Structures are given as C-alpha cells and as structure tokens.
Amino acid sequence: MTERVVLAYSGGLDTSVAIGWIAEETGAEVIAVAVDVGQGGEDLDVIRKRALACGAVEAEVADARDEFAEEYCLPAIKANALYMDRYPLVSALSRPTIVKHLVAAARKHGAGTVAHGCTGKGNDQVRFEAGISALGPDLKCIAPVRDYAMTRDRAIAFCEEKNLPIATTRKSPYSIDQNVFGRAVETGFLEDIWNAPIEDIYEYTADPAVPREADEVVISFKEGVPVAVDGRPVTVLQAIQQLNERAGAQGVGRIDMVEDRLVGIKSREVYEAPGAIALITAHQELENVTVERELARYKRQVEQRWGEMVYDGLWFSPLKRALDGFINEANQHVTGDIRMTLHAGRAVVTGRKSEESLYDFNLATYDSGDTFDQSKAQGFIEIFGLSAKIAARRDLA
C-alpha cells in the first residue's frame, strides 16, 4: 500500500508546491488539510479544489473558528495570557488547533506522516511537531522547507515547471500569520530593530494617532467567559470579532517587541490583536474586583508559566492541563460587567460591576460610613513586621 502524508495546507505557493514536492521526494500520496481559524482570505472550497489540482489525492477543509475561539482563545483570556507581558499568543494558540485536525486526518486516511510548512528557524516547527507527537506518538513529521531545502525560488521554479494553478509572483517582504485572535508581522525591514514600523504593515488596526470619537463598550463575563457586548449576548467568537472591529478602529492592540524565541534567538515581531487585548484587559480588571488576594497573587505566577508553555508548544502537556484546572477554578467568581473606553490606541477601564465583587464600599471609603476598624491596625503592623524587626536588631548591632 502506498504511504500517505497529511499536509497542513494553507492554499499558498509554498504548501501548494509541497504537495508535488513531497510526492517526488518520498513517493507518498498527499492528503491536504486546511483549517480555518479566522485568518480570512479565500473561500475554503476554492482552497480545497486548488489542493486537488496541485496533486493531492484527498483534500479536506475544516471551519474551526468557533472551536479555536472557545477551546484555545478562551483559555488564554481566562489566563490573561501575555507572553513576556505583551504578546497574546496569537500564532501559538492556533497551532494546537491545526495539529488536532491534522492528527485526526492522519487517522482517518491511514497516513503515517504529517507534514508542515515551517522553517527550521522558528517556533512553529516545535509547536507542530511537539503537538503531533503528543496526540500521535507513532506519527512521523516532515517539513519540506526545512528538510528538503525548499527555498521560495526553488518553489517558484517547481511551480512553473509543473504548471501548477497558483500565482508565482514574488511575495511581500514580510512574513505574515493571522487568525481571528490577531495578526503577526515579521522579517523585511523590521529585522533592523531601529526601524520604526510603517503604517502599511497594519490591517487589523487603524492609525491610533488619527483623531476620532472615542468608543465606549461594556463587556459582560460569566465565570471568566465573555457572554455579552453592550448587553447583547455573544459567543466567544463573536466577542472577539466585535472587539476586533471596534477596538481595531481605535488603534488598540498594536505591539512592537523583541521577543525570546524558543529556538534561542531574539526576534523582532509586530502584532495586531485588538480584540484579544481589549478582552484580556477587561477580564483582568474583573478579576481584580472578584478574586481573593492570595489567589490572585498566585494566579499571576500561573499565568506566566501557562503563557510560556503555550508559546513553547506544550499545549497538550500534563502540566498545561493541570494549570488549566487551576485557572478555571480561579475564574469561578469572575462574573460581572466591565465598561471600557476605546480611544487613541488604548483600552481604558472606566467602570466595574459585579454581584461577586469583593470590593466593600464601606470598608474602602474614607468618608462617613467607614466601617474599617483602624484601631486594629497598630497591632497588625507590629506582628506583621516582627520578623524583619528581630533580624534588624541582629544585623544593625
């Protein structure tokens, strides 16, 4: 029986060429799998037909937008996930979604190998292959760009030689990856970290410097899940989409950073994530109102580790699953409304309301009605600072 390879297919030049390239290099039949995580662009059926025209023996497309939002983006919102305190894991979250569909297709079609289009220099090769090995330990992985030196020039030459039905124009100088949770731009002139980004690289966000009227929005959460925008019920996907549009129109969610890649190098990345940043900002503030202090302090440590694990491609690891359980428990009381003003590139919280609130006005106020017993403060301070006081007596003697 002829071996089969499942290919993560985007519909672009590189993965279209990879179909024939893999067949020639390995003698295997190729099954192309395209997964829609809200990246936009061409119709899925057009992509499916192109894969078949390029030589795939089977081609599958999956509309995974709701799955991606609910099973991958939502946990990131609950975790307030910002890698290096800034990056909302736009690309890292989509990879396990795609991996899940690739492994399912491999089982369905009896394939023993899964292929992806990543280079040998980035994080995504690790995310794909670590995920595939976790869900299908028996499956092999190949990466034509990395393993067979399939450069873009060679891909174009192959495409023209085989007369494949895809444009062979030189691509943009940038490497772009996008989904409903955000957009990542790298390479080109951005590799010089002194160069400022130009406005042309942005698509999800308007120029925040352009004067415009501010937009006020109320986001409602139930146990950490966004359930309504301005009082109208939404799914998680709809919440992200609506905030992408509204926050993006105000220039919210632009990030320009040098980040530590898993492979050991530093890389300059420009991100747009208007919906993600607005939702995480709102969720984080609602946690400030509803989560007990010690739990909140410890959760911040968990959030950092959770984000690092997802960035590093360990979505399916035992520790990640255990941290999910902690984060879900910590979100049990994160229910209420957050009012935000979206304007000039910022999402600013201006109001909070929750039946689960731990904010006690009578304890917090300095005006009449204050119920905080200040007479207990002195004794508390004496006990609280006693250890340091004893040490100081020794050290200053």
Swiss-Prot record:
L-citrulline binds at residues 87, 123, 127, 175, 259, 271. Its main location: cytoplasm. L-aspartate binds at residues 119, 123-124. Its EC number is 6.3.4.5. GO terms for biological process: argininosuccinate metabolic process; L-arginine biosynthetic process; urea cycle. Keywords: Amino-acid biosynthesis, Arginine biosynthesis, ATP-binding, Cytoplasm, Ligase, Nucleotide-binding. ATP binds at residues 8-16, 117. The keyword Ribonucleoprotein does not apply. One of its GO terms (cellular component) is cytoplasm. GO terms for molecular function: argininosuccinate synthase activity; ATP binding. It is an enzyme of class 6 (ligase). It catalyses: L-citrulline + L-aspartate + ATP = 2-(N(omega)-L-arginino)succinate + AMP + diphosphate + H(+). Belongs to the argininosuccinate synthase family. Type 1 subfamily. This is Argininosuccinate synthase. It comes from Streptomyces griseus subsp. griseus (strain JCM 4626 / CBS 651.72 / NBRC 13350 / KCC S-0626 / ISP 5235). The lineage of its organism: Bacteria, Bacillati, Actinomycetota, Actinomycetes, Kitasatosporales. The gene is argG.
